């Protein structure tokens, strides 16, 4: 039993390796980009809109309200990044219903990359909103003695994001694989359904935490 797709090497030339995690990640990205292009190719501003566009607008509206409730008033500025995070993680986790599929989020390399994107995005959004000086001032609030603690907090929460998502998805896959070998068929099916729900919850938690971190970084201007 493989712990993650990192152990399955598809192609190797010297030190360059193409493992299942990388291949699956690129395949998911291609599917998502193609699906997005297909879904948005005939958007209409008129009164007569296709039903699928109404559904998309409802979903986007819900996402915007969720972002605004966290504290980011200009939700459309952050929706492309935060929405992409959620969709990629959710789609990656939902595809576990495909036999033989190894979710990229079950690999620490993938979750670390996602967490690093949040680590980079937070100061970028903070600087864009408050300016370089305004953003850097948040590290010495409420007192300059908090500077090292705030830096440690930035690093530790990035690590926590990566490990939390990796641990939950990998453990779920391992438990399901074990149950398939030692229990009747019905129980693993129920666990698969629970795994899909857990995958959606993890995608929601990851994106909400990213939203909270960005909201905190953009708060300097308001203060």
UniProtKB/Swiss-Prot annotation:
Keyword ATP-binding: no
Location of the protein in the cell: Cell inner membrane
Keyword Nucleotide-binding tagged: no
SUPFAM superfamilies: F1F0 ATP synthase subunit A
Chief place of localization: membrane
Stated name of the protein: ATP synthase subunit a 1
Transmembrane segments: 20-40, 78-98, 108-128, 174-194, 196-216
Assembly information from the UniProt record: F-type ATPases have 2 components, CF(1) - the catalytic core - and CF(0) - the membrane proton channel. CF(1) has five subunits: alpha(3), beta(3), gamma(1), delta(1), epsilon(1). CF(0) has four main subunits: a, b, b' and c.
UniProt-listed GO biological process terms: proton motive force-driven plasma membrane ATP synthesis
Organism: Chlorobium luteolum (strain DSM 273 / BCRC 81028 / 2530) (Pelodictyon luteolum)
Membrane topology qualifier: Multi-pass membrane protein
Keyword entries, A-Z: ATP synthesis, Cell inner membrane, Cell membrane, CF(0), Hydrogen ion transport, Ion transport, Membrane, Transmembrane, Transmembrane helix, Transport
Family classification: Belongs to the ATPase A chain family.
GO molecular function annotation: proton-transporting ATP synthase activity, rotational mechanism
InterPro entries in alphabetical order: Alt_ATP_synth_F0_Asu, ATP_syn_F0_a_bact/chloroplast, ATP_synth_F0_asu, ATP_synth_F0_asu_AS, F0_ATP_A_sf
Pfam families tied to this protein: ATP-synt_A
């Amino acid at each position: 039993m493989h712990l993650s797709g990192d152990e399955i090497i598809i192609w190797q030339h010297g030190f360059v390796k193409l493992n299942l995690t990388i291949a699956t990640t690129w395949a998911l990205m291609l599917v998502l980009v193609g699906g997005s292009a297909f879904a948005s190719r005939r958007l209409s501003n008129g009164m007569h809109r296709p039903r699928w566009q109404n559904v998309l607008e409802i979903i986007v509206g819900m996402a915007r309200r969720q972002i605004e409730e966290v504290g980011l008033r200009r939700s459309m500025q952050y929706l492309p990044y935060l929405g992409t995070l959620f969709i990629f993680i959710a789609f990656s986790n939902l595809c576990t219903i495909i036999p033989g599929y190894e979710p990229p989020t079950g690999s620490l390399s993938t979750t670390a990359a996602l967490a690093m994107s949040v680590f980079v995005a937070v100061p970028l959004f903070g600087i864009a909103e408050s300016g370089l000086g305004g953003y850097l001032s948040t590290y010495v609030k409420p007192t300059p003695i908090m500077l090292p603690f705030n830096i440690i907090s930035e690093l530790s929460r990035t690590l926590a994001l990566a490990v939390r998502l990796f641990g939950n998805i990998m453990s779920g896959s391992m438990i399901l694989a074990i149950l398939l070998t030692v229990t009747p068929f019905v129980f693993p099916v129920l666990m698969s359904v629970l795994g899909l729900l857990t995958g959606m919850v993890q995608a929601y938690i990851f994106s909400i935490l990213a939203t909270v971190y960005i909201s905190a970084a953009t708060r300097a201007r308001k203060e």
